[in-house]
């Protein structure tokens, strides 16, 4: 059974409460007050109009801030008459908000959870996946002073997940299957990722499974360590994918192609050298993007360097099929969905990684 656990439900002493406030302060941007204002016309449908791209302040979305800034700089070097595209990042507090904005057409593009896009497309929402945004980047965290050395030792323990729709939950299920365990062997609670580090510190949960930087926040603070990481267990892990509405594909395919090129270029650039990752941290930590403590994002980039990767953004059909089957087994997708229903490979096949100069 999956229970929802809110931060008001976590019983902590005064010291733990103060520690929670510190951790949440470091990650304040992960709970933004709202999205940047963007009307229905801000999707980049008109010539010369910026394309608003929704995303969350998580490292799985790091290629997006890099792409936005790099494109703005390259526009300044274009000769008169050359097509200019502009991309504007819009920060959201959670996947439901991104989903609603994309469904309503308030935004035309966003980084989304891959299984969620599959489900939306199956329900006739006109959206398509056009690129990956990253690989890997999920962790299962336990307290540093806990006795847990193997995943099986978590049997009977309370483990937090963002939601049953999150790909992190599929990662947890893969680890259960690896040990011949089922979700019935543990106690699963749903919890907002920004609350997870404090909940672990307060012993309100025994472990949590989520994406970065919420694992790194507790690890850097010294009271948590990763028990399992996708880099070791599921290297081709896919969570966030670049998704666009079909009317944008139909009305401005050149813009979609350029955006895919920019994201691909950002991924290559991020994985080329550590210096580039540090530059990306400085960009993403700013108020226009994640608005987070740069030390935590930098920790994700270095410990280890392949904790999250961006250089291999190939869209491989078999990987999406595996993700779908895992989602069906988890009950978040009800039936098999044709690959072509949610995927448009055209832009990835024609992609040329943009040169990133930052």
Predicted features along the sequence, with ranges:
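N-terminal secretory signal peptides
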Residues: 1-18, 26-32
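C-terminal motif of bacterial Sec signal peptides marking the signal peptidase cleavage site
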Residues: 36-37
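Short, glycine-/small- and polar/acidic-enriched structural segments
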Residues: 45-182, 187-190, 206-212, 223, ...
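Solvent-exposed, acidic/flexible segments
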Residues: 57, 91, 95, 165-169, ...
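Solvent-exposed, polar/charged alpha-helical surfaces in well-ordered, non-transmembrane soluble domains
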Residues: 100, 104, 118, 152, ...
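Pocket-lining segment of extracytoplasmic ligand-binding domains
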Residues: 115, 146, 195-288
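Secondary-structure end/capping motifs
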Residues: 250-335
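Conserved C-terminal helix/tail region of periplasmic/extracytoplasmic solute-binding proteins
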Residues: 323-358
